[in-house]
Amino acid sequence: MSTSKRKRADEAQWNKRSTKKKGSAPQAKKPGGKVEKPSLQIQTLLHSGDTMITVPSGGVCDLINTYARGSDEGNRHTSETLTYKVGVDYHFVADAASCKYSNRGTGVMWLVYDTTPGGNAPTTQDIFAYPSALKAWPTTWKVSRELCHRFVVKRRWLFTMETDGRIGSDTPPSNQSWPPCKRNVDFHKFTSGLGVRTQWKNVTDGGVGAIQRGALYLVIAPGNGITFTAHGQTRLYFKSVGNQ
Protein backbone atom coordinates (compact mmCIF):
# COMPACT_ATOMS: atom_id res chain seq x y z
CA MET A 1 0.00 0.00 0.00
CA SER A 2 1.33 3.44 -0.91
CA THR A 3 2.15 6.02 1.69
CA SER A 4 -0.65 8.37 0.51
CA LYS A 5 -3.34 5.66 0.76
CA ARG A 6 -2.17 4.63 4.24
CA LYS A 7 -2.30 8.28 5.31
CA ARG A 8 -5.87 8.73 4.05
CA ALA A 9 -6.99 5.53 5.85
CA ASP A 10 -5.46 6.71 9.14
CA GLU A 11 -7.20 10.08 8.83
CA ALA A 12 -10.57 8.42 8.17
CA GLN A 13 -10.16 6.19 11.23
CA TRP A 14 -9.26 9.19 13.37
CA ASN A 15 -12.29 11.12 12.17
CA LYS A 16 -14.60 8.23 13.11
CA ARG A 17 -13.24 8.18 16.66
CA SER A 18 -13.50 11.95 17.05
CA THR A 19 -17.10 12.13 15.80
CA LYS A 20 -18.50 9.62 18.35
CA LYS A 21 -21.21 11.14 20.54
CA LYS A 22 -20.18 12.01 24.02
CA GLY A 23 -22.34 10.76 26.89
CA SER A 24 -24.91 13.36 27.76
CA ALA A 25 -24.62 14.95 31.21
CA PRO A 26 -27.19 13.82 33.77
CA GLN A 27 -30.19 16.10 33.80
CA ALA A 28 -30.93 18.00 36.95
CA LYS A 29 -34.09 16.94 38.73
CA LYS A 30 -36.90 19.35 38.27
CA PRO A 31 -37.90 21.06 41.49
CA GLY A 32 -41.41 20.56 42.78
CA GLY A 33 -41.69 16.91 41.86
CA LYS A 34 -42.94 16.00 45.35
CA VAL A 35 -45.21 18.36 47.24
CA GLU A 36 -44.67 18.43 50.99
CA LYS A 37 -47.83 18.17 53.03
CA PRO A 38 -48.43 21.09 55.41
CA SER A 39 -47.93 20.29 59.07
CA LEU A 40 -50.92 19.91 61.36
CA GLN A 41 -52.20 22.89 63.29
CA ILE A 42 -52.44 22.59 67.08
CA GLN A 43 -55.00 23.97 69.51
CA THR A 44 -54.47 23.57 73.27
CA LEU A 45 -57.29 23.93 75.80
CA LEU A 46 -55.93 24.57 79.30
CA HIS A 47 -57.98 23.76 82.40
CA SER A 48 -56.44 24.83 85.70
CA GLY A 49 -57.30 27.18 88.52
CA ASP A 50 -60.44 29.10 87.58
CA THR A 51 -60.78 27.10 84.35
CA MET A 52 -60.63 23.63 85.92
CA ILE A 53 -63.41 21.23 84.94
CA THR A 54 -65.92 20.37 87.65
CA VAL A 55 -67.41 16.92 87.02
CA PRO A 56 -70.75 16.51 88.83
CA SER A 57 -72.94 13.45 89.12
CA GLY A 58 -74.35 12.84 85.66
CA GLY A 59 -71.21 14.16 83.99
CA VAL A 60 -70.26 17.11 81.84
CA CYS A 61 -70.14 17.67 78.07
CA ASP A 62 -67.78 20.28 76.59
CA LEU A 63 -67.10 21.30 72.98
CA ILE A 64 -63.38 20.93 72.20
CA ASN A 65 -62.98 21.74 68.48
CA THR A 66 -63.37 25.45 69.24
CA TYR A 67 -61.41 26.82 66.28
CA ALA A 68 -62.16 30.53 66.01
CA ARG A 69 -61.49 32.23 62.68
CA GLY A 70 -58.04 33.86 62.55
CA SER A 71 -54.43 33.65 61.42
CA ASP A 72 -52.81 31.96 64.44
CA GLU A 73 -51.87 28.29 64.56
CA GLY A 74 -54.85 27.40 66.73
CA ASN A 75 -57.33 29.23 64.48
CA ARG A 76 -59.22 27.98 61.47
CA HIS A 77 -58.17 29.66 58.24
CA THR A 78 -60.96 28.33 56.05
CA SER A 79 -64.62 27.36 56.24
CA GLU A 80 -63.81 23.70 56.92
CA THR A 81 -61.50 21.84 59.32
CA LEU A 82 -60.36 18.25 59.78
CA THR A 83 -59.43 17.09 63.29
CA TYR A 84 -57.06 14.12 63.11
CA LYS A 85 -55.66 13.60 66.63
CA VAL A 86 -56.52 14.42 70.23
CA GLY A 87 -54.35 14.18 73.35
CA VAL A 88 -55.81 14.48 76.86
CA ASP A 89 -53.60 14.91 79.94
CA TYR A 90 -55.49 15.43 83.20
CA HIS A 91 -55.22 15.03 86.94
CA PHE A 92 -58.50 14.06 88.60
CA VAL A 93 -59.04 14.98 92.27
CA ALA A 94 -62.03 13.69 94.24
CA ASP A 95 -63.85 16.61 95.88
CA ALA A 96 -64.40 17.03 99.62
CA ALA A 97 -68.02 15.85 99.46
CA SER A 98 -66.98 12.52 97.94
CA CYS A 99 -64.03 12.05 100.29
CA LYS A 100 -66.34 11.85 103.31
CA TYR A 101 -67.24 8.28 102.36
CA SER A 102 -65.41 5.05 101.61
CA ASN A 103 -66.27 4.35 98.01
CA ARG A 104 -65.05 3.05 94.67
CA GLY A 105 -66.33 3.94 91.22
CA THR A 106 -65.53 3.53 87.53
CA GLY A 107 -65.82 6.72 85.54
CA VAL A 108 -65.88 7.16 81.77
CA MET A 109 -64.47 9.65 79.28
CA TRP A 110 -65.80 9.81 75.73
CA LEU A 111 -65.03 11.67 72.53
CA VAL A 112 -68.43 12.18 70.89
CA TYR A 113 -69.02 13.42 67.34
CA ASP A 114 -72.18 15.46 66.73
CA THR A 115 -73.21 15.62 63.08
CA THR A 116 -75.71 18.48 63.50
CA PRO A 117 -75.22 20.37 66.78
CA GLY A 118 -78.09 22.78 66.19
CA GLY A 119 -76.57 25.76 68.02
CA ASN A 120 -76.45 24.38 71.58
CA ALA A 121 -74.17 21.87 73.29
CA PRO A 122 -76.11 18.80 74.49
CA THR A 123 -76.13 17.38 78.00
CA THR A 124 -74.97 13.85 78.76
CA GLN A 125 -78.60 12.79 79.04
CA ASP A 126 -79.36 14.24 75.60
CA ILE A 127 -76.64 11.99 74.16
CA PHE A 128 -77.15 8.80 76.14
CA ALA A 129 -80.78 9.11 77.31
CA TYR A 130 -80.04 7.14 80.50
CA PRO A 131 -82.79 6.70 83.12
CA SER A 132 -82.34 8.54 86.41
CA ALA A 133 -81.70 5.22 88.17
CA LEU A 134 -78.47 4.81 86.12
CA LYS A 135 -77.18 8.35 86.55
CA ALA A 136 -74.30 7.18 88.79
CA TRP A 137 -73.28 4.30 86.50
CA PRO A 138 -71.89 5.76 83.26
CA THR A 139 -70.41 2.41 82.19
CA THR A 140 -73.99 1.37 81.37
CA TRP A 141 -74.80 4.35 79.15
CA LYS A 142 -75.44 3.94 75.42
CA VAL A 143 -76.30 6.46 72.72
CA SER A 144 -80.06 6.57 72.39
CA ARG A 145 -81.47 4.72 69.41
CA GLU A 146 -83.44 7.76 68.25
CA LEU A 147 -80.27 9.87 68.02
CA CYS A 148 -77.71 7.30 66.86
CA HIS A 149 -77.65 9.03 63.44
CA ARG A 150 -76.58 12.27 65.14
CA PHE A 151 -74.19 11.24 67.94
CA VAL A 152 -71.24 8.94 67.23
CA VAL A 153 -68.90 7.76 70.01
CA LYS A 154 -65.38 8.07 68.59
CA ARG A 155 -63.49 6.94 71.71
CA ARG A 156 -64.41 5.58 75.15
CA TRP A 157 -62.01 5.21 78.10
CA LEU A 158 -62.51 4.01 81.67
CA PHE A 159 -60.83 5.08 84.90
CA THR A 160 -61.20 4.08 88.55
CA MET A 161 -61.36 6.38 91.57
CA GLU A 162 -61.50 5.54 95.28
CA THR A 163 -62.16 7.32 98.55
CA ASP A 164 -61.59 6.13 102.12
CA GLY A 165 -63.55 8.58 104.27
CA ARG A 166 -60.61 10.97 104.63
CA ILE A 167 -59.54 14.09 102.79
CA GLY A 168 -56.03 14.68 101.53
CA SER A 169 -55.09 17.08 104.34
CA ASP A 170 -55.90 14.57 107.11
CA THR A 171 -52.89 13.13 108.96
CA PRO A 172 -52.83 9.70 110.64
CA PRO A 173 -51.99 9.24 114.35
CA SER A 174 -48.33 8.67 115.13
CA ASN A 175 -48.91 4.97 115.80
CA GLN A 176 -50.87 4.31 112.56
CA SER A 177 -50.40 4.45 108.82
CA TRP A 178 -53.13 4.78 106.23
CA PRO A 179 -52.87 2.91 102.93
CA PRO A 180 -53.09 5.09 99.84
CA CYS A 181 -56.21 5.14 97.70
CA LYS A 182 -57.02 6.52 94.26
CA ARG A 183 -58.60 9.81 95.25
CA ASN A 184 -56.09 11.41 92.85
CA VAL A 185 -55.79 9.91 89.37
CA ASP A 186 -53.51 10.82 86.46
CA PHE A 187 -55.29 10.30 83.15
CA HIS A 188 -53.39 10.38 79.84
CA LYS A 189 -54.69 9.33 76.43
CA PHE A 190 -53.61 10.03 72.86
CA THR A 191 -55.66 8.97 69.87
CA SER A 192 -55.30 9.42 66.12
CA GLY A 193 -57.30 8.61 63.01
CA LEU A 194 -60.37 10.57 64.13
CA GLY A 195 -61.12 12.24 60.79
CA VAL A 196 -63.65 14.70 62.27
CA ARG A 197 -64.77 17.05 59.50
CA THR A 198 -66.32 20.33 60.65
CA GLN A 199 -68.15 22.80 58.42
CA TRP A 200 -68.33 26.32 59.80
CA LYS A 201 -70.84 29.10 59.36
CA ASN A 202 -69.73 32.50 58.06
CA VAL A 203 -68.88 33.83 61.54
CA THR A 204 -65.60 34.38 63.38
CA ASP A 205 -66.11 32.69 66.75
CA GLY A 206 -65.46 29.03 67.55
CA GLY A 207 -68.51 28.23 69.65
CA VAL A 208 -71.01 25.49 69.04
CA GLY A 209 -73.34 28.03 67.42
CA ALA A 210 -70.71 28.67 64.74
CA ILE A 211 -70.68 25.02 63.64
CA GLN A 212 -72.88 23.97 60.76
CA ARG A 213 -71.88 20.30 60.87
CA GLY A 214 -69.41 18.24 62.88
CA ALA A 215 -68.93 19.20 66.56
CA LEU A 216 -66.56 17.19 68.77
CA TYR A 217 -67.30 16.91 72.50
CA LEU A 218 -65.25 15.75 75.46
CA VAL A 219 -67.67 14.00 77.82
CA ILE A 220 -66.65 12.97 81.35
CA ALA A 221 -68.84 11.23 83.94
CA PRO A 222 -67.96 10.04 87.47
CA GLY A 223 -68.70 6.53 88.66
CA ASN A 224 -70.73 5.65 91.75
CA GLY A 225 -71.14 9.27 92.78
CA ILE A 226 -67.41 10.08 93.22
CA THR A 227 -67.54 13.64 91.89
CA PHE A 228 -64.23 15.35 91.18
CA THR A 229 -62.37 18.19 89.48
CA ALA A 230 -60.13 17.81 86.44
CA HIS A 231 -56.94 19.82 85.96
CA GLY A 232 -54.86 19.61 82.78
CA GLN A 233 -55.14 20.16 79.05
CA THR A 234 -56.63 18.87 75.82
CA ARG A 235 -54.58 19.20 72.64
CA LEU A 236 -56.13 18.92 69.18
CA TYR A 237 -54.27 18.38 65.90
CA PHE A 238 -56.18 19.61 62.86
CA LYS A 239 -56.00 21.14 59.39
CA SER A 240 -57.85 23.99 57.73
CA VAL A 241 -59.21 22.69 54.42
CA GLY A 242 -61.74 23.77 51.82
CA ASN A 243 -62.47 27.29 50.62
CA GLN A 244 -61.47 30.51 52.30
Curated annotation (Swiss-Prot):
Annotated region described as Disordered, given as residue ranges: 1-39
Origin superkingdom: Viruses
Protein name, as recorded: Capsid protein
Native organism taxonomy: Viruses, Monodnaviria, Shotokuvirae, Cressdnaviricota, Repensiviricetes
Subcellular location: Virion; Host nucleus
Keyword check for tRNA processing: no
Species assigned in the record: Maize streak virus genotype C (isolate Set)
MF GO annotations: DNA binding; structural molecule activity
Record motif Bipartite nuclear localization signal, residues: 1-24
UniProt xrefs under InterPro entries: Gemcoat_MSV, GV_A/BR1_coat, Viral_coat
